[in-house]
Amino acid sequence: MTDSTSAPDQRAKETGDYRDTVFLPKTDFPMKAGLPQKEPLILAKWLESDLEAQIREARRGRDQFILHDGPPYANGDMHIGHALNHILKDMVVRTQTLKGKDAPYVPGWDCHGLPIEWKVEEQYRKKKLNKDEVPVEEFRAECRAYAQHWVDTQREQLKRLGIGGDWDHPYLTMDYEAEATIVRELLKFAANDMLYRGAKPVMWSPVEKTALAEAEVEYEDIVSTQIDVAFEIVENPFPELVEKAFAVIWTTTPWTIPVNQALAYGSDVEYALIREGGYGYIVAADLVEDTQRRWMPPEPGTVAIGGGDVVHRFKGSELAGRTARHPMHALGGFFARPRPFLAGDFVTTDSGTGLVHMSPDHGEDDFDLCKANGLDPVFAVEGDGKYREDWAWLGGQGSVINLKFNAPDGPICSDLRDAGALLAASADYKHSYPHSWRSKAKVIYRCTPQWFVPMDKVMTHIEPKPPREKRWENEGGAINPHEEDLCAAPTLRQAAMQAIDDTRFVPAKGRNRIGSMVEGRPDWVLSRQRAWGVPITLFVDRKTGQYLNDPLVSDRIVAAVKEAGVDAWSDARAQEYLGDSYNAADYERITDILDVWFDSGCTHAFVLESGRWPALVRHDGGTHSADLYLEGSDQHRGWFQSSLLESCGTRGQAPYKAVLTHGFTMDAKGFKMSKSLGNTISPIDLMRDYGADILRLWALSVDFTEDHRIGKEILAGVADQYRKLRNTFRYLLGALDGFTEEERITDVAAMPELERYMLSLLADLDAKLRQAVDDFDYNAYTRLLADFCNEDLSAFYFDIRKDVLYCDLGPAAPLGTETRRAYRSVLDVLFHALVRYAAPVLVFTSEEVWGTRYPEAGSVHLLEWPDFAALLRHPREGGGPASNDGEKLDSRLRGNDELIEKWAQIRGTRALVTERIEPLRREKTIRSSLEAEVWLPNEAGDVDYEEIFITSTVHQGDWDVKRTENHKCGRCWRHLPEVTADGALCNRCETVLDAQ
């Protein structure tokens, strides 16, 4: 009721119909959200008003918070992982913006690499074209167009999700300027002698015919063939015990036997000689039982050695200086060379036989040990995974990753069996094996000439840093094992480890995860043998094998790439870059391209340092490091690490101050999503069915730091939670209908105790939400907000004060009673605080809420964090850094522990009363709690229990609840002693309706 004239009230008294004398909440804000239809309209309004530019202008000159976007791959529609990742980033940016900071967001995309090449090659194959017959410039143009298509597609999908940012100016790694920056960063490594060309075993994909970075590899459980192979020792060390002695090796990669060059033993390992049929077989003593179990039943053509006796034990060091014959030594040539026994500190007795066959072509330990002993790779396996056609054994017969090639009845095992060297072969060994994360095919270690960044070479161009004394709290201290060396110029590994120790990780376990990876990683393989990527822009002297390191040449190359992109790197322009000082005929132009992880690892240089995005330039001229990198936990071995190594190698520090990681999204049953399982969930479909705000609420409600789930039932629960939050705002809008400044009470001390209590709870919520933002704990943020709305407001405060809201207004109280004025004043504070708190989570709904009350005002996303003193005086403008008065008021409200404890006990009693009333309601003894009369022990004298419990009367005495005999007020429906008959008025209603 907004009309305070007395005529309707007089008629109500005469007719007994008081409906028009009570206040009924009124709002145009509907309970049914209709998000899929409404959100695009709100988004269009934001775009039309250029909201992003308004936000940037409003925060110009403020303290900065810079989140640097890890670029998603420009290939395919947005998936649920993209959605979660970008919602979290948006939450970071919006909460920092809400706190008054200048928090720009520049989205980016990773545009080079093999997956795009594959898709373009597919298009060529459909046209009956061979990619190798197409000019490389044309092929790259197709790749560029393909990437741009998916950039445009994903951009619209992310905008629909409500992600704010500079969408008109994203960064793309295929921009010419970005490609030039990547080249410049590469040439910094070259200038500082931090590149080398070498032949080392690297992860290689025979299907994709290229080297892979560790981050491009995923591990899958497979079943492999395991074999035991006997190598005859050239000079029998135990002639008094056996006629011949054999060293037995075990492997799950039979295809590597053709390039065996040595056998490794453990010097301190105890070995056993098993005698059977006059022959002796050497295995680790601890593995005799396991080995003999594999040897039963015996392979055809071999002796039954599964039951042989151990006739001698000896230390591995006794094998030093001895040699063995390759099982296929009869082929002559390479196979006829003696295979030396070499001591290897990596040899264990965990599995196998305790002896390891060595091939420098196909293993890191193998390569290092063989190289130290003068054994070089033979490069027998080619890029497609086949042995060279001219290789004496198995040349050109099949890919080494082919199951049949390695099978017990395949060519390798068959030939070993014919040679009498195969002791056991079975296709039953289950283990985890590396696969290409793109093609899903198995990868191998293959020794090829590649370009590397050394991890353990001293970087004389980097200033040494003293060890940091302060550690991040509650993270278990430092993990840097190299701190004692940091008084000198560091290696890349040392610099990276120190940078890790200087970085904040959320969750904290991320520190040890990336630290252990960096501590144990090999040199960084930069080169790839593909076409779509940034070239390794080096000229190598054909005589010396050294790459040219000339700043003028480097500058010309960078300038050309900035103007024409990667196509600028061509033979036709080689002399142009070399200038008059060098002859192009004397130099090899490298045609390999860079690892795409180097591309993305350089984005900090392009995005944060170039000045192309002025909002990202530090106002204080300080470090270019981002405040935060935020990606999935798999990026500890991907973007987090490549960015770290690139930045430490060129700048001596990490490109980030903090790293936040999230887990993976599983289906409702906890299974990994995959197209083959048919359990993928499209965020595009979810936005169509539920709306983006539901998807956002889900993402910010789960514990995203761990793997989490999504499914229909889960989303139904989220939708229910959304409805409760929406209903809270609907109630606030309706209850504040007609609220005026004249009605407002700003003196908290003059308010009823319940209002003071609610403001204390709000202040407590505010402090906890601020802490959640500082902790990046958005699960807690959303839970706190929802619990406050559901438990403290809807189920408690709103419920209690409905009577005051509806009935404490009339001709005698045109502004309402003091209690009603205080209630509506607090509701106004709640509205302006909660709409701000909810804005980063429910970006569309909060805009709808704000626009419903203030249709001519600007966007809710221009508001700042609530300042309580300002909120109480002028809630609509009550944002920004807290004033001194606000800080004092916040402190007073938050520090009222006695009041909060008192009301916690009252709420506990209220819950007990509600529990005791419920049986009477179920039995239909009463229809509502207003008809109940309650007896309480230890009733406090200063509390209006009838109001708190929403009951008729409350007496002191033993616990009891009964139906009251009091009559019901015809206006407020309360059953009170002063009501003389049903339909008559209580004292309060008489008073507010009496204008005299």
Labelled PLM ranges:
Residues V443, L548, L976-V979, L993:
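Cys/His-rich microdomains that often coordinate metals
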Residues D110, V202, P206, L212-E220, ...:
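Acidic, turn-prone loop/beta-hairpin segments
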Residues P467-R468, E473-A489, L872-E898:
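Intrinsic disorder/low-complexity segments
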Residues W973-L976, N987-E990:
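Cys/His-coordinated zinc-binding microdomains
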Residues K13-P115, D168, E177-R184, P239-Y271, ...:
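Structured secondary-structure scaffolds
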Residues P201, S432, T537, E965-K968, ...:
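Short metal-coordination and nucleic-acid-contact micro-motifs, chiefly zinc-binding Cys/His arrays
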Residues A407-Y433:
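Phosphate/diphosphate-binding loops
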Residues D175, G396, I401-N402, G545-D555, ...:
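A broadly conserved sequence feature marking short terminus-proximal activation segments
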